[in-house]
Swiss-Prot record:
InterPro entries per UniProt: SmpB, SsrA-bd_prot, SsrA-bd_prot_CS
Cellular compartments per GO CC: cytosol
Protein name per the record: SsrA-binding protein
Source taxon at top rank: Bacteria
UniProt xrefs under NCBIfam families: PRK05422.1, smpB
Function according to Swiss-Prot or TrEMBL: Required for rescue of stalled ribosomes mediated by trans-translation. Binds to transfer-messenger RNA (tmRNA), required for stable association of tmRNA with ribosomes. tmRNA and SmpB together mimic tRNA shape, replacing the anticodon stem-loop with SmpB. tmRNA is encoded by the ssrA gene; the 2 termini fold to resemble tRNA(Ala) and it encodes a 'tag peptide', a short internal open reading frame. During trans-translation Ala-aminoacylated tmRNA acts like a tRNA, entering the A-site of stalled ribosomes, displacing the stalled mRNA.
Broad class of the protein's primary localization: cytoplasm
GO molecular function terms noted in the UniProt entry: RNA binding
Compartment(s) where it occurs, according to its Swiss-Prot or TrEMBL record: Cytoplasm
Similarity remark: Belongs to the SmpB family.
Residues passing through the membrane, by range: none
Keywords assigned: Cytoplasm, RNA-binding
Residues of the signal peptide: none
Length: 156
């Protein structure tokens, strides 16, 4: 069976861009078990509570829910286990330096397959305040209304 080419998105963290100001993004590989890969290929994953932390100078992703593979037996994985992210040392150093600054965190944005390999897009982000979230929603609503008015004007 030939490897797939291109990018197949499995899961996205839609709340991440709502709750955080995204500064930098990185692409990282993930150390997964076989049943996790099979479950991901079926499109099963949830990134709602996902976050990344450093342990022993390595970046780990937590809170991601990959359900057990339905045809797996006793070899199945734990659904909410910690998963190691695979990055170059210089990227890890840059990320850890940014995290040491106050207010920055690392959040996963997207989980996908790229040329047959599972990847995750992570971002260095700063948390939004409540008034920032309301302002963003207001801007999006104004943009939608202006597009709607423009569409109605063009119909006439």
């Amino acid at each position: 069976m030939p490897k797939e080419s291109g990018r197949k998105v499995v899961a996205t963290n839609r709340k991440a861009r709502h709750n955080y100001h995204v500064m930098d993004t990185y692409e990282a590989g993930i150390a997964l078990m076989g049943t996790e890969v099979k479950s991901l290929r079926e499109g099963h994953a949830s990134m709602v509570d996902g976050f990344c932390t450093f342990y022993n100078d390595e970046l780990w992703m937590e809170g991601i829910h990959i359900p057990e593979y339905h045809q797996g037996s006793w070899t199945n994985h734990a659904a909410r286990r910690r998963r190691k992210l695979l990055l170059h040392r210089d990227e890890l150093d840059k990320i850890s330096q940014k995290i040491r600054e106050s207010g920055f965190t690392v959040v996963p944005l997207q989980l996908y397959f790229l040329d047959g390999r599972a990847k995750v897009e992570i971002a260095i982000a700063r948390g939004k305040k409540d008034y920032d979230k309301r302002q963003t929603l207001r801007e999006q609503q104004d943009k939608r209304e202006s597009l709607r008015e423009l569409r109605e004007r063009n119909r006439r």
